[in-house]
UniProtKB/Swiss-Prot annotation:
Belongs to the UPF0735 family. InterPro entries: ACT-like_dom_sf, ACT_dom, UPF0735_ACT_dom-cont. The lineage of its organism: Bacteria, Bacillati, Bacillota, Clostridia, Thermoanaerobacterales. Residues 71-146 form the ACT domain. This is UPF0735 ACT domain-containing protein Teth39_0139.
Amino acid sequence: MGEDGKLYIIREEILSDSLKKTLKVKELLESGKVKTINEAVKQVGISRSAFYKYRDYVFPFSKFSKGKIITLSMVLDHMPGVLSSILDVVANARGNVVTINQSMPSMGVASVTISIDTQYMEMSLENFLEKLSSQNGVRKIEILGE
């Protein structure tokens, strides 16, 4: 694949074991839990050749989102405090709201689009999205773009 290859976001559940293990090796190395590639591949149970084959082609989504502006689309229950709890999660993660737009509520729900600067965020995007999704009144969250 060339440098201009297309990028895709793929759910972890459908990744092959080799790709998952490659990501785990990279995580161990970046965290400093292991010192060498050889040590990491032995711990994870993947061959060095498989690691080298995939290492430049598989990355966690958070690698591409850190320090960028992400745009989220949400469907929220039209209840007091729901949007406020979303904004609290953003603030507690040290995200910075760039834009926010809420539609008029209809049939008990409202659509909200929020653009967030992730430069200073102190948690991974995955954890951030899980935290948002777990808030009362959140029905749906989608990443629209970066």
